[in-house]
Amino acid sequence: MAPSKKAGKKVTPKKAAGNNAKSKVAKADWKEGFKKKQVGVTDMTLLTTISNESINENLQKRWTNGEIYTYIGAVLISVNPFRDLGIYTDEVLQRYRGKNRLEVPPHVFSIAESAYYNMNAYHENQCVIISGESGAGKTEAAKQIMQYIAAVSGGQDSGIQEIKDMVLATNPLLESFGCAKTLRNNNSSRHGKYLEIMFNDRGEPVGAQITNYLLEKGRVVGQIENERNFHIFYQFTKAASDEQREAFGLQGPDAYAYTSMSNCLDVQDIDDTRDFEGTINAMQIIGLSPEEQNEIFKMLATILWLGNVQFDENEEGNSVISDTGVTDFVAYLMEVDAATVQKALTTRVMETTRGGRRGSVYDVPLNPSQATSGRDALSKAIYNNLFEWIVAKINVSLKTRSAYSHIIGILDIFGFEIFEDNSFEQLCINYVNEKLQQIFIELTLKTEQEEYVREQIKWTPIKFFNNKVVCDLIEERRPPGIFAALNDACATAHADPTAADNSFIQRSAGLSSNGHFESRGAQFLVRHYAGDVMYNVAGMTDKNKDSLIKDLLDLIGTSGNAFLQNLFPDRPDPNSKKRPPTASDRIKQSAGALVDKLMKSQPSYIRTIKPNGNRSPSEYDTKAILHQIKYLGLQENIRVRRAGFAYRNTFEKMVERFYLLSPKTSYAGEYIWTGDAKSGCEQILKDTGIAKDEWQMGVTKAFIKNPETLFALETMRDRYWHNMAARIQRAFRNYMRYKHECARRIQRFWKNNKEALVYAQVRDYGHQLLAGRKERRRFSLLSYRRFMGDYLDISGKSSLGEEIGEACSLGREPVKFSASARLLVSKLGRSSKPSPRYIVLTPKAVYIVIVTAKDGQAMFSLERKIALVTIKSIQMSTLRDDWFTLNLGPTEEGDPVLSCYFKTEFVTHLMQLTQAGINFNIAPTIEYTKKKEKKAQIKFVKDETIPKDDVYKSHTVHVPSGEPADSVSRPPAKRKAGVVRPITQGKLLRAGGPSKPNNSRPRPTAQPLPGQSKPAVATPSVVSTPAAAAVVSKPKPAASTPAAVRAPAVTPAARSVPPPPPPPPPARAEPEKEMYRAKFDFQGQEGEMSLTKDDEVELIEKDENGWWLVKKDGVEAWAPYNYLERIAPKAAPAPPPPPARPRPTSTVPKPPLSSTTADASAKPVAVFPGMGASNGGPTPWKKSAATTDSTPNSSRPGSAAAKVPPPVAAKPKPPVVAPKPGVPKPGGKPALPTTARPAPSGGGAAAGRLGGGGGGPGQLDLAAALAKRAQRIADED
């Protein structure tokens, strides 16, 4: 609503406030001071004095202030503003959605919301009855109710949306064909309609049906001065297309007698051209085909041209057609013979009967007056049947597509009419309004008081006028009423309308005994509830017969237009002796059916009032409105409402609706009350805290006095489900937090171990390559053995690695494998002898590097580079030795024969790089090619006298027995059980484990609801134990590690050292509360926490809107978050340190710089995560990110059939997982060091590299570190 401006006050436009200006809260606060103040009372039951004058004064105050709606309890009073107040926008509509009438100002949307809510909540049909004078705003109210229901009824299905569109499209279509301008209303409904919208059990519209009542067809052929015909005629004549004008000979509205006789062609605020476009669009939405639309317009053109047929009187006094060209065009439109049209309009066929047998047939000429009546009768019949056809077509389109459960009906019917000349049409209209008033009285006054007496409710009777006596005066048969007298007059003098009218006058004289009827010769007076109306008898019996003469029906029967013939499906049977139903019969039958429908639904009332007869937005006619207040019975309605009860229902339905509100009648959503429905209903009302004077218990029903009480019950019921939903959501969120915490733990473990999995996959691939054909060394099968590849750390840029990389000129080429090895070297005149080397494997080649001494410095040089594409096969023996040969093609240098501790890993990486394109042979002997293509062979012999490794001498390798050939890696060693932190973040468990279930209150047995035959099946109570319940356990003693897995001790002294006791577990911490301290003073309002500076509060819940739920002294309330600062949690006491463990003494001798042979202890036993470097310092476990897999550029020949495809061994670099802010991590691992590893000890890089023997000094340092690690594991075990 726009802010009101005071006179003479300058209003400065406000500047935009950036993004904050878009906030809904800020916008509402800005408007708070500009809201229009309420004038008068919104509910007239609150008036201090109850009189017609006080009601009128309250309505006038509100209407003058632009507030046209006022309540009397649940009845809405609407005063037509005759202007657009902007109160039907989408924004206003949304404010009424889901609100009861006490939460928002009075509005027609509130009535629509109440009807829709009650239908869904109570599963009862609803109807909205709109009554009032013509021009009071009934049609507009019905349109807004339909608009609201279409907006809130949901349903995204295309079929449901189509139903909504078609329901809304009926408004412009029926307004065009059924509304006209009258002296009192520019858009007066000249018919009545009852729209029934069908809904499924989800509250979605699935169909609709329209019932039409009493179209004022007489308006087609005549209107009084300054009124108009139906809108469609002016729309059609003004906005028809050129094709239509050509086909139908169409001209402007001034060219036709039916549209120009009242001298009113245009109406202010009505655009006929624009409305015609809306009519065409509505026809398309409803589903009328272009052919059907064309036939409709042809019928309209036929009616217009029929009105232009004029009659002259000849010498004999008979009628003749003035212009036969008009009748010729009418015959063209009706597709009949022109002569037949002329004859049907100017003559009448009369048939005589004699003794019940057919006699002679005569053509009786008609005088001009009779011919004009026949012409008008034909026009009225065509238009009336056309309107009925359109309504039937709409109902076919709106037919339900699926099953429906409930209905909302909207009654928009003609208002009470009092004119200077009142005839049969006004009698029927006022009769229907009398019936509606009777329904209002029956349901709101008479029936209600009778129910109070029947239910023995304390009640003060209210006197009121019951208009049933007026309804009986019009519709009763015995004694005969007005309609019965009309029918008798038509039956006795059916041939002569004048004689029939005189007969009716005589018969109606007998009705004078009724105090509400008065006969005055050719007129009679009826005292309606809305006032006294004088009716003229002339022509009333003819209108009551409402039938075409046989000649005109025969004319239509000869038409070649099938559409025209379909408009008249029922032809009277000339041989039938049964009297055809009259217009009064049909209107009485329709009104009775309407009353039956309305009585089967729960009604909502809208009483419309017309403020003046000039359609002025500023004129308030106090006298006219006071008259409407009186005949609408608003004063009696207020008295009954104040003395009565707003809501009543049977005990069974009350219990079924509200049993959830009492803990004695419900448990976990089940009905548990064992008493009768009445006692259960009384228990519910007591437990909800409702005052005793607000409700009474009757014989079969419970009565609630004020609607506020009912709304409170509904709010509590809605909150019950909301609270239950919140509990379920809270439990689900706890479950999700628990689940996410478990997932995070798994993810952390995975991030810390996923690289190890990659290395283990490569190791398993190595097992597949060997395929149980070669004996294994025990240390090759350790569970912690990983195929890490680059043992010389060439990719890591260590000092040794840089030297080797420069010697090989690797550049950016990634290194897949590097280690120390021995190469079998042949010397002139001497037997071959192993010599230390370094071997490097890249995706392109194998590099063999030799170290020589020059001037006391180590010099690295590339001895040989072997391209991978030149390697044909690899050979190994079946024993546990370390020898293998790379068989190449014809070369001068021959095949290299190498001995390497990591031979299996080298072969595995080589097979991966070549996609298993190399033959891999394992046999008791290996063959290789020496220089100049000389063949040689090495034999392998088992020799148990060899203490360890193997010994080469004269092409024979002596090797001890190893592990069986089918051996695989040992399973991972069991870690020592420590104190596991329980997963309690989701609050599913208390710290320390789950609590025992509370069995203090047994689960009640479910009972059947009142009206049910079988009790509801009780859901078994299932107590589920979360998976986190078992995570807190006492530390178990470490299981002994098998000898095959545990590394041997190095010295006896180390074995004698007892293992240290495990550290004590940390004290079990109580659940940590998140505490905050107030930074400033804060004065809270209702629902807010008042704070004093330095107050300490416990945080319960955070909300995104800036308010936090806190707890202080056992009270929970909301506080602004920026007034609080967190109190740092107290650090948990550290556990006592474990006793110091004596450091084992290593007996591994440090290799001298001049050593040239490998020491036996230099053999690597395993590769462990976090193993020491050559100098005993820490070494990162993961490989460098520079190491990647690649494939040789050239393709290789096919390999042997026994090849195993390598697994994908990608090595992603794990991201560093940072701890969550604000969450302490006691005992967490420190971050990995980011600096480079220190250089090996022993007197500098050169000194460390000049070591000889076996695997080289670098390998010796590595072996020493491994030995220390093995000793440490042995000590721990």
Swiss-Prot record:
- Per the database record, which ranges form the IQ domain? 722-742, 743-768
Q: Where in the sequence does UniProt note compositional bias of the Basic residues kind? A: 1-13
Write down which residues bear the modification named Phosphoserine: S360
Positions contributing to ATP binding: G132, E133, S134, G135, A136, G137, K138, T139
Q: What UniProt keywords apply to this chain's record, in alphabetical order?
A: Actin-binding, ATP-binding, Cytoplasm, Cytoskeleton, Hydrolase, Motor protein, Myosin, Nucleotide-binding, Phosphoprotein, Repeat, SH3 domain
Domain observations? The myosin motor domain displays actin-stimulated ATPase activity and generates a mechanochemical force.
Name of this protein: Myosin-1
High-level lineage: Eukaryota, Fungi, Dikarya, Basidiomycota, Agaricomycotina
Instruction: State the encoding gene.
Output: MYO1
